[in-house]
Amino acid sequence: MFFRVLLTECLKLKRTLALWMVLVSPLVIVLIEFAVSAKGAHVAIEAGKDVWPPMVRTTIEAWTMLMMPMFVTLETSLLAGLENTGKNWKSLLALPAPRWTIYVSKLIITISLLWAAHSVLIVATIGSGRLLKSIYPSLSLGSMPLSPFVVPMLRVSASALLAVVIQHWVSLRWHSYTVAMGFGMCAMIMGIFAVQSKVLGAWFPWSLPIRAVLDGVSGQDRITVVAVVGAILTATIGCWGFVRREIG
């Protein structure tokens, strides 16, 4: 029954903005970074510096701190909006499938969309690096190793789970697109300020992903554990509340 509900939720994504944003959001970051790198290419060539490490670092930081929180907010709001717009909750919850399957299915889809966007970000950045090299053959990009990119993005993917789960709960708890978007934007702004503090940034859900990139190995491991455990607990509580709540 669960997999049937999950498949149904996946089919709802067909031709939706939520699906398109998986491509659009990371590509915006990649294009901006490509433009910045191209503008400074002549300086980098003269200095003989390998531009791949800073290119990867700024791409990850821009995505994690700015675009990813907006992406998560938009995706959760759009997925909840599939039911809110047409007031489909009553008919959806009248189906024989247990309520928890609906909550968990939408959460799994949200996480999958985020991780898919991360894959697009990695592939597109590699493509932009090769394009940059073809335009400026003298530009040093080294061997363009994947480990400095993939490993941090894996940490980001895991440490973002707590923020995703909270935003998912907010989007389903209040059937207002404005509430969900407003909450997400406020959380993003607070996260930008909180990340400056090693104490607050290591616990605030929207700061965890960027702290997982900036902190040392021991800090990264602790942040990942906090995010994953917190996500499991929050998802359990949110699902329990969703099952018990009267939704109209």
Which sequence ranges carry the predicted segments?
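Secretory targeting signals
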Residues: 27-74, 104-168, 172-174, 213-216, ...
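Transmembrane helix-loop junction
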Residues: 82, 95, 130, 134, ...
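Pore- or pathway-lining transmembrane helices of multi-pass membrane proteins that form conduits
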Residues: 21-27, 174-191
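Transmembrane helix boundary and interhelical loop/hinge segments in multi-pass membrane proteins
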Residues: 74-91
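Short helix-to-coil transition segments within interhelical loops
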Residues: 93-99
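Terminal transmembrane helical anchor/hairpin motif
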Residues: 35-57, 61, 181-248
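Aromatic- and glycine-rich beta-strand/loop motifs that create alpha-glucan
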Residues: 1-26
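Alpha-helix N-cap/helix-start motif at helix boundaries, enriched for small hydrophobics
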Residues: 101-104, 242
